[in-house]
């Protein structure tokens, strides 16, 4: 099965109106590439503004959401609100949510289930820390994080898995093409065993972790790497080269 290439841009807590305008300008000026799903995730205050300015071929995602539609949850946003803005995607389980904000596998799984039930597609992030990799626990950590949503019986057609080795996020260190492909292959084998061969074949598994215009082409050639989740590089014009890494 041919899986459509997916490139996400996670702006994290960066930007203002002027910088959003700058990013919109270079994205709107880029040649349309219908062979790639392009989704960018601005900070919550700029979601509606970015959506109003971006061309039709670039979708907008939220960076996070909570597990219920509304209520006394100060500072949170819900999938219902994301949908009300006309958006289709949310990023969940990012390592910064797990490690800076203490989100557990169980909470992330609940949030994922609720987002999917509300009609929002999910970029579901997993990944190991450096000490976990060095201790030989890469497979265990990633499988544990995935098992949390497998146990919930989620529907997989609206999930993209983002493998982001924590030791490579924002550090300038990148997993080699071989290291990334190895883990992506393990993830696909896990889906085949725990869910179904059809889901394993159809689910897009994208790589994140210091992806740049320089390394994207090599990573994009690997058979189980179906795209990228890009951090800092998505704020710069070179992001267009990453979008077109397979072209």
UniProtKB/Swiss-Prot annotation:
GO terms for biological process: cell redox homeostasis; determination of adult lifespan; gluconeogenesis; glyceraldehyde-3-phosphate biosynthetic process; glycerol catabolic process; glycolytic process. InterPro entries: Aldolase_TIM, TIM_sf, TrioseP_Isoase_bac/euk, Triosephosphate_isomerase, Triosephosphate_isomerase_AS. It is found in: Cytoplasm. GO terms for molecular function: methylglyoxal synthase activity; triose-phosphate isomerase activity. Its EC number is 5.3.1.1, 4.2.3.3. It catalyses: D-glyceraldehyde 3-phosphate = dihydroxyacetone phosphate; dihydroxyacetone phosphate = methylglyoxal + phosphate. Pathway: Carbohydrate biosynthesis; gluconeogenesis; Carbohydrate degradation; glycolysis; D-glyceraldehyde 3-phosphate from glycerone phosphate: step 1/1. Transmembrane segments: none annotated. Substrate binds at residues 10, 12. Keywords: Cytoplasm, Gluconeogenesis, Glycolysis, Isomerase, Lyase. Homodimer. This is Triosephosphate isomerase. It comes from Caenorhabditis elegans. The gene is tpi-1.
